[in-house]
Design a protein with these regions (language model features):
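A short acidic, Gly/Pro-enriched loop at the edge of an enzyme's catalytic core
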Residues: 103-114
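S-adenosyl-L-methionine
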Residues: 80-105
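Conserved beta-strand signature within the Rossmann-like core of class I S-adenosyl-L-methionine
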Residues: 139-147
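A short glycine-rich, Lys/Arg-flanked "PGG" loop and its adjoining helix->strand segment in the class I
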Residues: 125-139
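Blade/loop signatures of beta-propeller domains
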Residues: 193-219, 257
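Conserved class I S-adenosyl-L-methionine
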Residues: 42-61, 67
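Short loop/turn segments that connect beta-strands within beta-propeller blades
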Residues: 266-268, 307-310
Length: 326
């Protein structure tokens, strides 16, 4: 009897372990993380993965500059993912796993750049589209799907579309060898205004038309750099802020951040890109224009055009026959 009991206990333990780690045990198709990152439209920022999918979460952290936050109600699965991340050399600054429910996500409104869930069949009963949209930043994207649905692919697809069917979103669905997926994008923030120039606009009238930020004023995020040099100029457009830091430091802690452009998410503070300014660059002037697509800056005898999301050079503007250094 003791042998039978021991055998039964071992079988039960194996079944429980397999159920807890079933998704993680199935290797993800090659390139799935790239497809999801492409559909999500971001490489830096904050990505929330709902439900443990260890292999996918680790690949997302490795192949991007995203901070990946994984949330799952099962403590055993969370502990297992932490161990796998530690063994893979992926630290907490790149991937953090937390145990908790999904009905109320632990994120402030308008915070997360990308939300991914690959176990829709298990999660849809716990997760609402309204809660996902609340946590997403404006124009942020959620990709919800079922990996390896097998013969239930059609049924899974129908459930996903029904789950995401909201009047203010236009879901996009696709099926591929990796599974069935649906993508929803949060609408832009109504009433939000840009601050494209040093004094708000080209007319130098520093009055915002923003209808969103109202008293009582609350902190949206705290993020590095916490200390900057001076002078400094901030412009904002398309949900991003562009901080230009000058040449003066009053403390050692500010040295490394002098003469620099720092582009950050206006919703969660994550640094999207940085660019060193030339020695002697004068920051305290109207040298920058921020738009949703392009960041313009004076650079010697030209105007440099940078991709607002990545900081990559897009081109330049020169005035024929005009020479000078601004």
């Amino acid at each position: 009897m003791k042998k039978i009991s021991a055998l039964s206990t071992g079988i039960m333990a194996a079944v429980v372990f397999a159920a807890t780690n079933s998704v993680s045990a199935n290797p993800i198709p090659q390139g799935l993380e790239e497809r999801l990152l492409e559909e999500g439209g971001v490489r830096r920022g904050i990505c929330a993965v709902l439900g443990i999918d260890a292999d996918l979460s680790l690949r997302l952290a490795r192949e991007s500059g995203l901070l990946v936050h994984v949330r799952d109600p099962r403590p055993g699965a969370v502990l297992d993912l932490r161990k796998q991340a530690d063994q893979a050399g992926v630290g907490i600054r790149r991937l953090a796993a937390e145990q908790g429910g999904l009905k109320a996500l632990p994120y402030a409104d308008n915070t997360i750049d990308l939300i991914i869930a690959s176990q829709a069949n298990e999660l849809l009963g716990q997760l609402s589209a309204a809660e996902v949209l609340r946590a997403l930043r404006p124009e942020g994207i959620a990709i919800i799907g079922q990996r390896d649905p097998g013969s239930d692919a059609r049924e899974s697809s129908q459930k996903l579309e029904a789950w995401a069917d909201r009047g203010d979103t236009k879901p996009a669905a696709w099926n591929d060898p990796s599974g069935v997926w649906i993508k929803i994008q949060k609408p832009p923030l109504k009433g939000a205004d840009n601050w494209s120039h040093w004094e708000k606009g080209p007319d130098n009238n520093p009055v915002s038309r923003d209808q969103v930020i109202k008293a009582p004023y609350m902190t949206q995020f705290m993020a590095n750099p916490l200390y900057i040099g001076m002078p400094s100029i901030t412009t904002a457009a398309g949900g991003r802020t562009f901080l230009a830091v000058g040449h003066i430091a009053h403390h050692r802690r500010e040295w490394d951040g002098l003469l620099r452009i720092i582009a950050r998410s206006g919703y969660n503070g994550k640094v999207l890109w940085e660019r060193k300014l030339p020695q002697g660059y004068l920051v305290h002037r109207s040298a920058f224009i921020a738009t949703k697509e392009t960041f313009y800056m004076i650079d010697g005898d030209r105007c440099l055009m940078l991709d607002a999301q990545t900081g990559n050079e897009q081109g330049e503007i020169r005035i024929p026959g005009v020479k000078g250094d601004w």
